[in-house]
Amino acid sequence: DYASMGRIVDRIRVMAYDYWFAGSAPGPIAPIEGVRGLVDAITGLVPPEKIDLGIPTYGYDWVRSVSGTCPAEETPETKAIGTARAARTVTERGITPSWDPVAQERVFTYVDTLAGTDANGAPVTCTVDREVRYLDAVAVHRRAWLAHREDLHGVALWALGNDDELTWDGLRAARLG
């Protein structure tokens, strides 16, 4: 009951992310229209100056498909990936991430080849098709700008340590208007 909470608390941190998650199919982490809708709904119940908008500094590296037989010690899994790690993956693999204009997030795909042995010691190889979605500095800026424009108290990043210096540039730019 946000209205009741809004009357008695000093601050509410709204988790405006994980719309799609590790256990789901690939999709946006914090689609901008979903975030806007959430802000509109909550500011109708709680004074904006009591709200901190949660912004993720991570994404997910989903497994889209696997072909072949993977090594016994390497089961492909969907995993969380920090913004800084996503940026390193892009650089290391020479990938140019796309901008999802609807979600306003970054997305890229890549293929991993895993080689090793199966449980019986026989050599095996599998190919893992992966999709990564994450919020870069531009995406963080757009959500922080939304918080600024709606006169929210501020933002809360999840989680510190996943970010990179460009994330902070995006936040500073949003604060300046």
Regions found by a protein language model. Give the residues of each.
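Second-shell loop/turn segments in exported
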Residues: 23-29, 129-133, 157
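Acidic/aromatic/glycine-rich contiguous surface patches that form carbohydrate-binding/processing clefts
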Residues: 138-177
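Glycan-binding loop/region signatures in secreted carbohydrate-active enzymes
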Residues: 57-146, 175-176
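Substrate-binding surface in catalytic domains of secreted glycosidases
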Residues: 1-93
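Soluble non-cytosolic domains of exported or imported proteins
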Residues: 29-36, 134-141, 162
